């Protein structure tokens, strides 16, 4: 069964791409009676506030017609930023040797919160070095993953 995020991603991918952007990912967070839909867009040239505003109008129009969310919600459109969230295998693969922070659904090595270096990805399995130990983590066990920005 498709999750709400999967259905929303399928619904919003084409309108976002029609504006010349990539749908980096999305998060649907339920908070009581009110929810938040965060849509992350990216582009090789970078994302500017005008891009977010234009995408927000387009996405809002699609959501108004399709009406996939039955509760009240707030739509937020932004770039992934420097501490970008990672959603897909190819995104993790693009950041091999980079440091990430991940939250897991089920603990691995006794923890649900890990910080480590991406050392590889094979299929839907992520290799992560944490404190010198190599861990293999199923992508579907990752609740949230973010790059840790280098300054």
Curated annotation (Swiss-Prot):
Q: Is Plastid there in the keyword field?
A: no
UniProt family annotation: Belongs to the RimP family.
Cite the source lineage: Bacteria, Pseudomonadati, Pseudomonadota, Gammaproteobacteria, Alteromonadales
Which PANTHER family does UniProt cross-reference here?
Answer: RIBOSOME MATURATION FACTOR RIMP
Q: Secretion signal: which residues?
A: none
Q: What does this protein do?
A: Required for maturation of 30S ribosomal subunits.
Where located? Cytoplasm
Q: Return the SUPFAM superfamilies for the record.
A: YhbC-like, C-terminal domain, YhbC-like, N-terminal domain
Q: Kindly provide the name given to this protein in its UniProt entry.
A: Ribosome maturation factor RimP
Q: Which Gene3D superfamilies match?
A: Ribosome maturation factor RimP, C-terminal domain, RimP-like superfamily, N-terminal
Cite a GO CC annotation.
cytosol
